[in-house]
Amino acid sequence: MNQFRFSRRPDIGDKIRVSFEFFPPKSDEMEARLWDTVTRLQPLKPKFVSVTYGAGGSTRERTARTVKRILNETTLTPAAHMTCVDAARHEVDEVIQEFADMGVTRFVALRGDPAEGVGAAYRPHPDGYANGAELVGALKGVGDFDISVSAYPEKHPESPDFATDIDMLKRKVDNGATRAITQFFFDNDLYERYVERARRAGIYIPIVPGILPVHNFTQVANFSARCGALVPAWMAERFDGLQADPQTHALVASAVAAEQVLDLVERGVGDFHFYTMNRADLVFAVCHMIGIRSHESEAAGSAAA
């Protein structure tokens, strides 16, 4: 596709709903940054916020602590990530029940990456759930939860073809998934074609675009190569030469993400899930540009008038 089309419709923010992803902090410093981010983004009133679960279930306790704190100290609705990699069924069921007892009603159900990370060979646990579809079924067996699942506009790196990829999404839906959230992408045509494939396969749940504001273009480009996400040439050109200019890099990044969202709105999309990387600056700026404003901002604007 060419570059995104930028909408100038004044009511655009009324048509957009957002959610945010956080990851559990590993240190006191990272925890402080996370809660600064939560505090900054909470007034935007996201539909929910998700908290990730590390590769191989490595962040189980930290994920639980973060979710509990969001429940107890904010007005936000948390969605706990659940994975089934490297875990027996009874271990996964125990974690599900732990979150349910805590008051969690939303989950993001993922097969998960091996402990070795993205690209490592996946081997189902001999006594575990084999994939994300089975995990969705397990969640529904515990309670009538709101369950988000993953979707891949450029197909999962392990899928041999799109038919296999779409079939797995269909199995998740048949087992009770509420919505799908996509891996990040930078070519909206690819997302649109993926949604068309899903609809032809009889999948009618919302397929929510995952939006990744680019805090570090080099890192994003490298990670994209590992997980099979295309970085368009025009986008690389926009960030070219900005490695040592973080201020301009941030301005470009917020504009690129806002343009992507507004182009998708013009195509009929209304829900967006932002991968925050536990940083508020770009996400807050993008939300402001697409018309999602905090009550504090509106009050300040009224006072200035």
Kindly give the residue locations of the regions a language model identified:
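Active-site beta-loop-alpha junctions enriched in small/polar residues
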Residues: 22-25, 52-56, 81-87, 110-113, ...
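Active-site mouth loops of central-metabolism enzymes
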Residues: 17-35, 78-90, 146-164, 240-255
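Active-site-adjacent beta->alpha loops and helix N-cap segments on the catalytic face
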Residues: 2-8, 29-32, 57-69, 88-94, ...
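Conserved N-terminal beta1-alpha1 strand-loop-helix module at the mouth
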Residues: 2-51
